[in-house]
């Protein structure tokens, strides 16, 4: 636009220029004046409109509906969710809030979902932020125990979310991290039989959805040992995402 305005200003200055005025009068006396014909005025070229940036398009996670299953509340003092009551049982006095999948609740390793409220997050989730998160994850102590097989930005309920699939092998660094984050305590480890019991757990598969709920980054992580339970966990997390409220 600035270049167009400068060009129009230069043309108006040139239109006011003339040859020697005395010579013009002489020529006008010798030559009859010709009829004045206005020169056609050229319309300034229009500046092409700037291209409109399109919103990025992400693969969609379809929100599930468990027909015939009622939703029940569960909370941990920080947040409350509504979950499919026929399929899950809340873990009592456990932080973060955890739901056990009923069909595996008596198994040695039970499939479950935990929900955590993280920090206030004013930004929209996007690929750049996901890349930054993945890069930061590599610097965490015990990072070698986590293998990330899928890390994508997807769309859930018309909102961008992070979708991840991981495999974790528990080692001492992971146990230390779980203690630091309040997931485990030394007392819990001792009651279970010591660290070796945890390190003997087979590689743990997980699928996670990170989304923004009421301005906070909220993490839904499903843990499973049998691939047959994976889709059930994903479907449940879509329901939890739409039915989460914060208590503090």
Spell out what each predicted region is:
Residues 1-4, 8:
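Positively charged n-region of N-terminal signal peptides that target proteins for export
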Residues 6, 18-105, 221-248:
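N-terminal targeting sequences that direct proteins away from the cytosol to non-cytosolic compartments
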Residues 14-16:
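C-terminal motif of bacterial Sec signal peptides marking the signal peptidase cleavage site
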Residues 79, 160, 216-218:
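Hydrophobic residues embedded in beta-strands of well-ordered beta-sheets
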Residues 101-131:
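A short acidic-to-branched-hydrophobic micro-motif
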Residues 116-124, 150, 223-230:
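Second-shell loop/turn segments in exported
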Residues 134-209:
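Signature of long, low-cysteine stretches enriched in small and polar/charged residues
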Residues 207, 215-225:
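Short, well-ordered beta-strand elements
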